[in-house]
Amino acid sequence: FNVWTKRIGNNPTVKVLILHGGPGAGHEAYEVFESFLPKEGIEFIYYDQLGAGNSDRPTDKILWVLPRFVDELEQVRVALGLNKDNFYLYGHSWGGILGIEYALKYGQNLRGLLISDMMSSAPAYSRYANEVLAKQMDPKVLAEIKALEAKGDFTNPHYMELLLPNYYEKYICRIPASQWPEPLNRGFAKINQEQYVTMQGPSEFGMAGNANLKNWDRS
């Protein structure tokens, strides 16, 4: 399989590899970094993990497990020539999970690790989503969402109609969806739903069911 990377800038001592969220989302949402990191002399590298963005998209679900992604990341590091003198990882959301696991196994190769918008425990995240975020929603809207989830009706257009203004605009990108940046919309349009559901689960209210990541805990 082939995975896609793109290098922006050149700094022999500071090279930041971007671990995108999702799982299955791709690099597009982070294109905003181009407006300020190069000015600071920071080299950074986009990396679409296998199954996401511009990388190959195999359909075998056996590939969507955390240890395999960790070893894939190590192969990418070697291919890019990154080492303990210059290699920084930036992990956002699911990328934070991947970054933590990589650091635990291959920490000797890292100069630094940055985690953004991710907790160190999937069960704690699930509790937060249900006990804090869900309770901030309109009870009638939440009841509709939960009813659709109970039926497994995640592909119902009304499900996304409810989530977009009541969840995504409040907790994912806090401006009206009509004003979302083009790269963010481009990334959402390309998300690998099969990979996302296999690892995260179909609901935004925590990881449940058969989600591969639901028991992950490094707290």
Which stretches of residues belong to each language-model region?
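Conserved HGGG/HGGXW glycine-rich cap/lid loop of the alpha/beta-hydrolase fold
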Residues: W4-R57, I62, R77
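Alpha-helical elements of Rossmann-like donor-binding domains used by nucleotide-donor carbohydrate transfer enzymes
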Residues: V32, R68-Q75, E101, N166
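Structured segments of extracytoplasmic/periplasmic soluble domains
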Residues: F36, V76-A79, K105, K170-C173
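Active-site loop/oxyanion-hole signature of alpha/beta-hydrolase fold enzymes
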Residues: Y46-Y90, W94
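Conserved hydrolase catalytic core segment
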Residues: N83-A129
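Alpha/beta-hydrolase
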Residues: A143-R218
